[in-house]
């Protein structure tokens, strides 16, 4: 029965603990995340903001190297040390000059403390900043006694009492203060000024380790860092300085000239890495600086890079145990090593040195937990800084969790003992404690009465319970589990300790031995203090207050317990008052007279038995609590009457509260039934008001009854909306978990994509016989069947039966608009379906394009409900309403499929592919029939609009080889063919019929009928693997072009009619020279590659009436005939076409020059302004210009 609250689930309280502890100590610190790029700052306290002048928004997400605090006086050496500490995940303290926001400088000690998880990987950095006062700056140590024991130095978070200890502490940050194995370098000379190292041979830029330079540079950008790498330790166990001497032999001669003083810059401790992970940080590739620096850790067994010569024993130890014992930092202020030139050879001779070097002979192997280091440095106590990980509450050895199974069992046991105490303590105090019982107990102790033994055991159990409460965790105000014994004791003392202690005191044992009446009465009263334990029962049972049945039982038990207590009090009043009554009118005397057991003063055992007394007292209290009493047991004395008044008053309150709650509880139990009848009444009223016929009425009632049984009248969507969106996504992900795991189309989706899909899914429950989709309904959703079976009927004929994990609907990505169902879908059994709306699915696919191709490739419909004629309906709707084209394009998606996916789709959906082939074959036959019976130009134009949907001829040989191209990719390619708009002239009109006849003959070049038909129909061998959706898209765009072509042709015909009607002067028309015979043996109508503005060409030759031939009289007659035929709705006759053809042959030599120009420039001619009716013809011919993207009619 424990309350499982607080720190039950594992959680990370690291940040909260750090912030809460540090804020009260006036610290100035930041916390950086070591797992993100540049170790970004994730928290800075108010002290840091006050110290630097920057606000928290200015500091957050900045690199923890604090580049914004750097300035001209900030030394690169200090910056490099901070960067090296961050790269190596090592603890270090550096004295740096920083700049306030207002530009002023300040000096502070920067303490970098890595916080690692249980695997030793640095998760965070705590960087503390502490001002350096002038006294600390001036206190430069003159000499440090190497033998001086340091045992009484109390460190308080970076502060030290003696300046002389600062240098020593810089060298051994994490060593215990009592550690005698300390390396101290005693220099012979000390000065306050640094001496230039004239003879010091600095490593060149080429000899510096590139990885180290890059690593350091990456952390101190944008400032440039020096390629020198400063370390404070050797690289080998046997001879720590031999590598240094071998690399720079001239350093031995120049060492005496170096300054041995510790300036502010050299005061910094240049500590080595504390583990293998830190050493690996030196050789990290620059590109991987901010990755997991410890992802390839192997505990020192395999270290790559320039540190291969280091022994595993050194790598496995810490910097405090093995590395500091070789420290020679006091010998040279700045040691610069070239890691790339370190060799594994060892020299036998040690380097000469004039200084006195004391190195401890033996160093212990120690492994300091980072948590302990941080705790020691920050002085926060033992359990202040937990490891950065998901962790269960830390408890001591003998501490009991308040939600543990043992505590739950113990609480139930104590609850039973409390109930026993509540019942037997008043009974024992009222009925059993008398002179005779006291005399028996003095003679034989507790062995005479078993009840006394039980009371003693209960007292012992309650004392043990008090001890357990001192070791039981509790939940504080921050919802955290407190396991500290001291805090638990304080919390228990402030709470229930006093009540539990009073209830557990065995008062009868404390005053055992005295046999007076006052003692007996006092023991009875003190034993009633055990009833205080009922308060614990109340706090334990509080969690069950929301259950109606539990509350009802609890109220009844309370009512009976109060009646029991009042019965004991009623008997105690009569028993105490009876010896002092002279008339014997008490209720006990009346009871003795009624049952024939009168009291005899000389016999103490006379009178009614204890059983008779208790039952009668309990009867009186129950009758008084529930009513005014029957009267057979009545109060006679004043004391009894006063008590009866109190019982009646308590009874009225108890009756009102208990039975009022009982009525509310009963009403709550039947609330579901009441809601059902209310909703059913609404359904029946709806049926009556709308006069719904009986079959449909029966279906409504049956569905309502089944739905109520299934959901108990609860609207699941309303319940789901009551939770935050994050919980809604998790709930939806759980509800659709089986579908998302079993369906092949959803495999491989990211977690975010699955959550988005789960939010869009709706669960539908259908009873048997319910029709889910009717024939002709718009398919607005995709259905996934998760339970049950359904049947699909066409004309009441079952065409398919679907079961679990089947999918039906339509391929939503292939169509711009939803289609119509071609069958009925009816449930055979109770079915659970997951459906997702078409728009919702497409929206998710748009948001996750990487998942879109996978989903659409692997989506396999068990049954496609889309009607076969839906494609034609879609094309017709688009052609009838061009204004909706943009809306349709919003739903068009460029879906690139691999060849395997296309083949899979074609094999998975044979019905669609067969329908497509049949549609192409029927359209092709229709095209051939139309071509064969082209009786007139107008009818041929109307007939050829259908086959021209794929008249985009690919003129380049390479384009046809590409497969799987979208139509958007084909349009620019086909644009190489230019539209030669020569329909302005009469010759172009008359050549339409001849083009049809001539086009049927094979051409010598590339215009064979088979090739042209394949190119025109778009069903060539190389493009046979196009998907149905891509063909649909091409059809849509081509239909739009045909519409524009039809309107343009109508305009051209109207303009021609106007020209024929208005032309009164016999003049030779400005014919296009490109209609000459021999030069045009290839298609002359081409698609323009680009939509260039059309320019008019002015001819140098102007025609005069004297140049006209006699044949123009025939031409005029033919024109008049054409005018009459066209105005009357009859097509152009063939006679006019023959006359025009012969006339053009005669006039070809006159327009040869213009023809050559037009061939070169591909510019369409207009009527020369010098000709008669030039203004009218120009206006009319301008209207003949087509859009450059319109497909032209192919001709010779």
Swiss-Prot record:
It is found in: Cell membrane. Residues 1-412, 471-494, 543-549, 663-1196 are cytoplasmic. Residues 434-449, 516-521, 571-614, 636-641 are extracellular. GO terms for biological process: potassium ion transmembrane transport; potassium ion transport; regulation of membrane potential. CDD domains: CAP_ED (cd00038), PAS (cd00130). The modification Phosphoserine is found at residues 174, 238, 319, 896, 899. Residues 1028-1055 form a coiled coil. It catalyses: K(+)(in) = K(+)(out). Residues 92-144 form the PAC domain. Signal peptide: none annotated. Keywords: Cell membrane, Coiled coil, Glycoprotein, Ion channel, Ion transport, Membrane, Phosphoprotein, Potassium, Potassium channel, Potassium transport, Transmembrane, Transmembrane helix, Transport, Voltage-gated channel. SUPFAM superfamilies: cAMP-binding domain-like, PYP-like sensor domain (PAS domain), Voltage-gated potassium channels. Residues 895-906 have a biased composition (Basic and acidic residues). Residues 745-845 are annotated as: cNMP-binding domain. Residues 41-70 form the PAS domain. The S4-S5 linker acts as a signal integrator where it both couples voltage-sensor domain (VSD) movement to pore opening and closure, as well as providing a binding site for other domains that regulate activation and/or deactivation of the channel. Belongs to the potassium channel family. H (Eag) (TC 1.A.1.20) subfamily. Kv11.3/KCNH7 sub-subfamily. Pore-forming (alpha) subunit of voltage-gated inwardly rectifying potassium channel. Exhibits faster activation and deactivation kinetics and slow inactivation at membrane potentials positive to 240 mV, resulting in the weakest inward rectification. The potassium channel is probably composed of a homo- or heterotetrameric complex of pore-forming alpha subunits that can associate only within their subfamily. This is Voltage-gated inwardly rectifying potassium channel KCNH7.
